[in-house]
């Protein structure tokens, strides 16, 4: 019999909701703590910049047990995603489990000798308290604390009326109207904000980035939805993955010329479609060498605006501020009223005790997580949403279903600590030696190996999987409804008080 646990889920974003639902559905008592005043994570209205929308199509950016409304466009806007998440929480009875405006300051092993953790919590009114939990699901993900970039001269820049803000704080399009906007970064949020600033009437818009990267348009060649290219098993199998034998390696070697030609063809198409040479934004890196979770979607209008000068593109980074001017690393000087730092988020779990931090993160920043979910040296704890991908919600959903069974000892393939550590060592070597591109974000990215990752999780859970037409399945994106059917075949159980 599985004993009921009191589970603390840290974070009420996409991953936290998945974890809360998974543990509650198995009979556990769940408390979800969220430092902000609303659910949604990056989709919380206070954090979402104007015109933000999903990079993934709606049939992929969803939970297995709830589709997005048919009325939504293929790539839903921020308010629509937030409404979907709110409805998901409500439909699974999670509203009563949420505690907003509550930050986890620290955690330590329980003093009463029982399994679990004691969390020190602080609310926005300054009140603090300690609470014991039997299990902790960390769902803060990779987009938690905004990165900062302290530079000389920034106080003088602000004193003259300049504004410096992280992209997550660019919440009002009117902010740009009639002003000089400089955006630092090469991510989709950077190009989204640059385009929004132009459309909002900014007097000048400049985007600053180190090197151009490959961006994928929503429709490759203007015709083919990119999900038919990036999200299919056939594409994934062009990359040699971990744990393959001699026969599979030989097959990859034989197919290498065809795979090479495939990528060169895609590069040529992107150069023509996006006019990369005209924009002087042809990447140096081969496209296949950089396929990971950082591959951005091309913001509609971005390249045309660069081509006609509405957006000025500068290579480099900020060096310092000089009055109302930003001086770049290459010496260029750009006048600015607003500096938007689209430089991402800090990766880490700051409330974890130092001795456990060392067990979680390698000296080179790589995370030690089995299936990107659990570490045998961090007992009574797991991570959801640290298996980032092109289909984030589906990844979080499957990870949450895996984690609750792992916590309850109910996986069909329940791993031993030795098995977990051996697998972690193998995956670390794969990221460092065989595919360095897999090491981005601390190695917390399953792209382009979505299907292999999902296959491993389902096999561990003990689901029955069947494919009516394996050939068709090889050329179609992941089907969330199919994964719901697979999960329904796993052994059922309920925790008891």
Where are these predicted regions, by residue range?
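Flavin (primarily FAD) cofactor-binding/catalytic cores of flavoenzymes
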Residues: 2-51, 55, 67, 72-219, ...
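N-terminal glycine-rich dinucleotide-binding loop that anchors FAD/FMN and/or NAD(P) in oxidoreductases
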Residues: 47-69, 226-237
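Non-catalytic, mobile gating and regulatory segments of ester bond hydrolases
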Residues: 165, 425-431
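Compositionally biased, charge-rich terminal segments
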Residues: 205-253, 429-437, 447
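Short, well-structured alpha-helical segments that form the helix of a local strand-helix-strand
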Residues: 419-424
